[in-house]
UniProtKB/Swiss-Prot annotation:
This is Large ribosomal subunit protein uL16. Binds 23S rRNA and is also seen to make contacts with the A and possibly P site tRNAs. Part of the 50S ribosomal subunit. InterPro entries: Ribosomal_uL16, Ribosomal_uL16_bact-type, Ribosomal_uL16_CS, Ribosomal_uL16_dom, Ribosomal_uL16_sf. It comes from Pseudomonas putida (strain ATCC 47054 / DSM 6125 / CFBP 8728 / NCIMB 11950 / KT2440). CDD domains: Ribosomal_L16_L10e. Gene3D superfamilies: Ribosomal protein L10e/L16. One of its GO terms (cellular component) is cytosolic large ribosomal subunit.
Length: 137
């Protein structure tokens, strides 16, 4: 599972997930990409689950890039614990996603195979996504 090796602070404030993705919105490495259309959060488990679906479908052909990393800790208090007594411990890690963010990239496979693989991966994610191709200028 993806998570930072070390952080400056153990816990973070909730914060807001506003705006559009300015960085990481272009296809940089591969030929085809899966791009987020909606905003939300991706947990480390969801990122890994979609990655497995991708790699299983393309088998040994092609190279895959994961363009998101879960770097925000989400804390949770245990069940049946009264309010107060401080903030809960870190339960899992998420990546905050804005519309336009490229999530996965792939190269070395046909467009048809890439579309099928990304459709399987998108089914594992809680966001609306779209298939994009690299534009050569």
């Amino acid at each position: 599972m993806l998570q930072p090796k070390r952080t400056k602070f153990r816990k973070q404030m909730t914060g807001h997930n506003r705006g559009l993705a300015l960085r990481g919105s272009k296809v940089s490495f591969g030929e085809f990409a899966l791009k987020a259309v909606a905003r939300g959060r991706l947990t480390a488990r969801q990122i890994e689950s979609a990655r497995r679906a991708l790699t299983r479908h393309v088998k040994r052909g092609g190279k895959i890039w994961i363009r998101v990393f879960p770097d925000k800790p989400i804390s949770k208090k245990p069940l049946e614990v009264r309010m107060g007594k401080g903030k809960g411990s870190v339960e899992y890690w998420v990546a905050q996603i804005q519309p336009g963010k490229v999530l996965y990239e792939i190269e070395g496979v046909s467009e048809e195979l890439a579309r099928e693989a990304f459709a399987l991966a998108a089914a594992k994610l809680p966001l609306a996504t779209s298939f994009v191709k690299r534009t050569v200028m």
